Amino acid sequence: MSNFTAEDKAAITSLWGKVNVEDAGGETLGRLLVVYPWTQRFFDSFGSLSSPSAIMGNPKVKAHGVKVLTSLGEAIKNLDDLKGTFGSLSELHCDKLHVDPENFRLPGNVLVTVLAILHGKEFTPEVQASWQKMVAGVASALASRYH
């Protein structure tokens, strides 16, 4: 059962078709690591995260940001089954990476900020509401396999 209306789905997919995954992914993960510095502990293997400029210029941050948004693209194709889409990622983050599920909401909120910056007037309050619903659904799906 989906909580997404036809209008939500249209708003999400329409904007997603205009998103440059490379630009938005790097910006989103970079901002996450700057704004919420405690999240850096999950990315020890990324090299220097010593300053905002080091983080924003770090190629591993950009590459992982692309990976995250590519996964999000899969979610957008499967809005009616977010838990199924993210089942294996939920298990990975729980069992192997030991990420506190409270952290799952942070990247989505940062992404919404990045989309607002990159898409300006096109990112209307209605579009934002649909995206907030979607990133909340993704965070919930990522936390679904925790025990």
UniProtKB/Swiss-Prot annotation:
InterPro entries: Globin, Globin-like_sf, Globin/Proto, Hemoglobin_b, Hemoglobin_oxygen_transport. Disulfide bonds: none annotated. Red blood cells. One of its GO terms (biological process) is hydrogen peroxide catabolic process. Residues 3-147 form the Globin domain. Heme b binds at H64, H93. Keywords: Heme, Iron, Metal-binding, Oxygen transport, Transport. GO terms for cellular component: blood microparticle; haptoglobin-hemoglobin complex; hemoglobin complex. It holds the Pfam family Globin. One of its GO terms (molecular function) is organic acid binding. Heterotetramer of two alpha chains and two gamma chains in fetal hemoglobin (Hb F). Belongs to the globin family. Gamma chains make up the fetal hemoglobin F, in combination with alpha chains. This is Hemoglobin subunit gamma. It comes from Alouatta seniculus. The lineage of its organism: Eukaryota, Metazoa, Chordata, Craniata, Vertebrata. The gene is HBG.
